[in-house]
Amino acid sequence: QHDEIYFEELLEEPYWGGSKTNLIDTMFYGNYYLNVYDVASNQLIYSRGYCTLFWEWQTTDEAKTTQRCCSETVVMPFPKNDVRIEISARNKKGKFVKKFEYTVDVDSYFIKKDRRMQYPTYDVHYTGNPSRRVDIVLLPEGYTADEMDKFKADCKLFAEGLFSLSPYKENQGLFNIRAVLAPSQESGVDIPGEYIWKNTILNSSFYTFDSERYIMTYDNKSLRDLSANVPYDFIYIIANTQKYGGGA
């Protein structure tokens, strides 16, 4: 199977939710790996392993007969000086092979700074400095403006469920959970197998990869733009539906 990575744009977001000191990923998890090097010294200053929806799609039957593209984003602390970004993919032998390289001029006027999806936010569980916490952002999918109170209540249920389990229960003080109050035009989510289509803010859908219970969004850019309302490490989508399902 073959994959290629193409550059689209650079965007400076208002917040960084990750650590400001622990910047090098030494675990080497995931099927892709981001390395960021200082251009002047060639020193590695940031790295992170991750997985993509595209990689998961490559394992499907559809990938055997057609080609497809997926939006992908990588995030990093905004650098002080010019950097070189390298993205590698894990091959069949488990080794990372470089697929993409791009040099970022930090003074370039092509680095966009627009806030694309600004909405109010809601603190579900806040304990302190984002750089020293695990920051979770909860995004609403298929909640209309009249259903924002329902979304807040569902966010509280999420937090209660998370902190009812170990080791989260013992470490509640190390977590922040925030929600973005972003309404959809219609209530509910897409269920293609039942011919149900909804106009929602993140374009999530059941039947991802033709798996009935798999709900996911291909709209990666909206996902990131909506999350950018708060500092975050992890993104969860709360879907307004009675149908059982999920995805990761």
Kindly give the residue locations of the regions a language model identified.
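Fold-level signature of zinc-dependent metallopeptidase catalytic domains
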Residues: 109-170, 179-191, 203-208, 216-217, ...
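Sparse recognition of residues in long alpha-helices and their boundaries
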Residues: 50, 174-175
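Beta-strand-enriched, solvent-exposed domains that form extended recognition/catalytic surfaces
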Residues: 1-110
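Residue-level detector of short, conserved catalytic/binding motifs and their immediate flanks
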Residues: 32, 83, 134, 175, ...
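Short, surface-exposed amphipathic charged segments that create phosphate/polyanion-binding patches used
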Residues: 192-199
